[in-house]
């Protein structure tokens, strides 16, 4: 059984991690739960999983109120060191970095130093400090959770690094794929939050609509896989999660129905593959379309 820390347990990826712990209670034990300020979610999860520790980054949260609402004998930290303290607890094997932004950077670095496995869903950490993090981490200590980078990781598994020619990330195009410049002038935030394939948090959904997310993912891929040869293609159905081209011009791709359940569970259990609720692909009722991105 593996002890889990969930940094960002109230978010979309955090909820997938908790679902994994629910589905496989013989595989995972929640050791620490951390949120920014969503204490309602934190309290609910604490009563369900009875962790050793809970942390809240927002120093404005009332410590005494939180203590009254939580089960007894749980360590509580509110404020600056909440995330770092979460990873430095006995019984921790895996740190799921599922928060957004750079707040978890120090906690991730500490976890690497302590020799913990990192299931990394936080792209901002790598964008801001990728060289430092990857130089500190051992091989396969960081397992990416982003669907695209998980796909690349899987495609490269067992391949010598000098076989790699380039990485090809796929992009759905977001909510506004196919819109004309005039149509884009009239779009609204509500429309931007309506992603055609993925159920994600608000920030990443907006970043997907503007294609900013893909820019961050390209930087993330360069750090994770130690290459500058990273391209992307528009693939509206999000069936191919990414591809790798090798020196012999062969291409290996990872395909699955769009769901974060697979990359989350893969990162937590690497290199096992446990059952999921993800819909099987029907190869007789699908087609794969790819488009070149517009040049600006």
Give the location of each predicted region.
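Catalytic, metal-anchored helix/loop core of enzyme active sites in primary metabolism
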Residues: 1-296
